[in-house]
Amino acid sequence: MYYNPFSPQCYYYVTVPMYNDGRSVYWTIPNEMEKVHRGADLRSSYEDRNLLLKDYGPKPFVVNINRATKQNNTFRTALWTGKHFQVTLMSLGIGEDIGLEIHPNVDQFLRIEQGRGIVKMGKSKDHLNFQRNVYDDSAIVVPAGTWHNVINTGNTPLKLYSIYAPPNHPFGTVHETKADAVAAED
């Protein structure tokens, strides 16, 4: 018999389907096992390629968000813009911040995928009484009407994605640098 790393250790204890769709519940070896694992190569080749970073909304979309976020090298790129929310990717250089800001009618969710930093939040720009260290896999929730800033304190770029509800930037937004983002706000 040939070595197959995906085959069960004992053929008597295979996972039996819950519903019978006309096939035998016991797989014949090796023909049926080949069919089960045929898609594994397709999945890995899909994940290895670089994604074209552009706005894919409002069409249905699936992405490896971790990989897309780490691939992004712009200050801000809209990845998906719909009617009710928006996903943007951000990359902050060493010592860079997103800038102290407030979204009066927009809730925001941010997730750190790489790097470390500090998030500051508060009811007024002069009183940011909420401060936390953030790092890989940290989630940040910013309620509407809250002043906030994220600062990269690490020695690598801080890579994160942000979800705005409702959308906060125009469809297709790409800001190469923070200066571009500030100019677009004016």
Swiss-Prot record:
Database matches in SUPFAM superfamilies: RmlC-like cupins
Keyword Cell wall biogenesis/degradation: no
Residues given in the record as ATP binding sites: 117-124
A Pfam family hit: Cupin_2
Range of residues in the leader sequence: none
InterPro entries associated with the record: Cupin_2, Flavonoid_dioxygenase-like, RmlC-like_jellyroll, RmlC_Cupin_sf
Domain (Cupin type-2): residue spans on this chain: 89-164
Keywords: ATP-binding, Nucleotide-binding
Keyword ATP-binding assigned: yes
Superkingdom of origin: Bacteria
Name assigned to this protein: Uncharacterized protein YrkC
Provenance organism: Bacillus subtilis (strain 168)
